[in-house]
């Protein structure tokens, strides 16, 4: 398994080249590739992210990213999703995931879902879609309060998902494992 994030190629042009070389090597050896889109506006513009990351998606099997990442990194406009209100409309994710599956042929598309009630009170769940069958699943929701520190939440989510899939869990069980690992 090879995992990378959108942060790595954002660091420099040399990092873009090295990331693509690593992805080519992974694919040449039939290694599953996952990405956490992880857009960081302080590292690069949405325009450059879209140019670079769209090219790298040809190597990706499993794509993790929220609706902002899908828009800023891949150019997909979210439909019925409003994270600023703390209310998440799953239909918006189904729409975005279908667009991503159509364009890139991902095996799985995943997003963590954070409902921010306050800085120390969040709802936490995730959703996944099988890119081939278009089966969509929304995980159990955790109510996290008080939040001690959000640093590393996305990384532990990705690690839990990868662990679940490598261990042979189906997509639903792998997603539940990822959400629990990062809650």
Label every model-predicted segment.
Residues 137-183:
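Conserved post-catalytic alpha-helical subdomain immediately downstream of the catalytic base
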Residues 1-144:
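Ribokinase/PfkB-type carbohydrate-kinase core domain
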